[in-house]
A protein has these predicted regions:
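Residues at the start of alpha-helices and the adjacent loop-to-helix junctions
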Residues: 6, 27-28, 77, 103
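Bacterial N-terminal signal peptides that target proteins for export
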Residues: 25-34
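C-terminal motif of bacterial Sec signal peptides marking the signal peptidase cleavage site
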Residues: 44-47
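Enrichment for repetitive, rod-forming helical segments
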Residues: 17, 34-35
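Bacterial N-terminal signal peptides
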Residues: 35-42
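Exported/periplasmic ABC-transporter solute-binding proteins
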Residues: 49-318
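Short, Lys/Arg-enriched N-terminal segments with co-localized hydrophobic residues
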Residues: 2-25
């Protein structure tokens, strides 16, 4: 922006002072001095005005930004994403007091259903949306848009007292289908395997089924279905015969991570794709987000949001 000012200058003309003995033309003495004073005044005025204008513009921009970030956002879905989604919302609201964000879990399927029913703005999901869900949304005139927000590895966990430290993907599938029922068949002690699984509304349940159990096959009827990653971690920590699966962000020293095909689930192996049960985590919206929703999603995908992904034990986007 050009901050130069047009200053109106009024020329006083030539003024003279007469005496009896001589006449002094003051124009040649006074004019240069007046010009110098005028220049200094102009520069000072211009500088002051420019500073005031910049300050005014900054204040206006801040006010506009605040106005843009006023509103409410509702989010529901994946239990795997719940901790990081809560951290995102709290941090964003701290930075933007005019924004209110409500976050609920309940499972990926529950979140996607809520989005399709029009009761939430974003659905968190630890699995990709299903064809039938897209069809239902389209029948209501919706245009579901997928946003990758993080990467996860589904860790297979057992009790720290369990001597088994590595299972093949094939063995793991047989265990969760109920075809292998005793730990001695995979190098452990003679004890019946206690299967712990997420419930069917969970995206983790769906992804593990597709990747490990078999898309067209079923979990063993003996599998105990639990409502959250934390519930599985707690059960495994309390039962020496238990085996379950949880998101990376829920792994603690109270459980032992079993390698799958020789690769242990970690931030590094999920990031490079070497761990066989790695996946993206998603947020879904009806159409491209606008206004405060767009600002929130951009923030999640930016440096601050992705740092929180790492802080919560998951893998930032590349």
């Amino acid at each position: 922006m050009d901050h130069s000012l047009d200053v109106v200058r009024r020329d006083a003309g030539a003024r003279s002072f007469e005496t009896k003995e001589w006449r002094v033309d003051l124009k040649k003495f006074v004019a240069p001095a007046l010009a110098a004073l005028l220049l200094v005044g102009t520069m000072a005025f211009a500088g002051c005005s420019a500073e005031e204008e910049l300050a005014s513009e900054a204040e206006s921009s801040a006010e506009e930004a605040t106005e843009e970030l006023e509103g409410s956002i509702t989010v529901q879905g994946s239990d795997t994403l719940l901790n990081v989604a809560t951290a995102w919302s709290e941090s964003f609201m701290d930075e933007n007091p005019g924004v209110d964000i409500s976050v609920q879990g309940g499972g990926s399927g529950t979140g996607i259903a809520a989005l399709i029913n029009g009761t939430v703005d974003f659905a968190n999901s630890s699995r990709g949306i299903k064809d039938e869900e897209i069809t239902e949304a389209e029948s209501k005139g919706m245009d579901i848009v997928e946003h990758s927000v993080a990467i996860d590895g589904i860790a297979v966990v057992v009790n720290p007292a369990n001597g088994v430290s590595d299972l093949s993907l094939d063995e793991l599938g047989k265990i969760f289908r109920g075809e292998i029922t005793n730990w001695k068949d995979v190098g452990g002690v003679d004890a019946e395997i206690v299967l712990l699984s997420r419930d069917s509304s969970s995206g983790t349940y769906e992804f593990f089924k597709e990747t490990v159990v078999g898309d067209d096959l079923e979990y063993a009827a003996s599998a105990k279905l639990l409502p959250s990653n934390q519930a599985i971690a707690d059960e495994v920590a309390a039962n020496e015969a238990g085996i379950g699966y949880i998101g990376l962000g829920y792994v603690t020293p109270d459980v032992k991570v079993v390698a799958v095909d020789g690769v242990v689930a970690s931030v590094e192996t999920a990031a490079d794709g070497s761990y066989p049960i790695s996946r993206y985590l998603y947020m879904y919206s009806d159409g491209e987000p606008e206004g405060v929703m767009a600002a929130y999603l951009d923030w999640i995908l930016g440096a601050e949001g992705q740092q929180l992904v790492e802080d919560e034990g998951f893998v930032p986007l590349p």
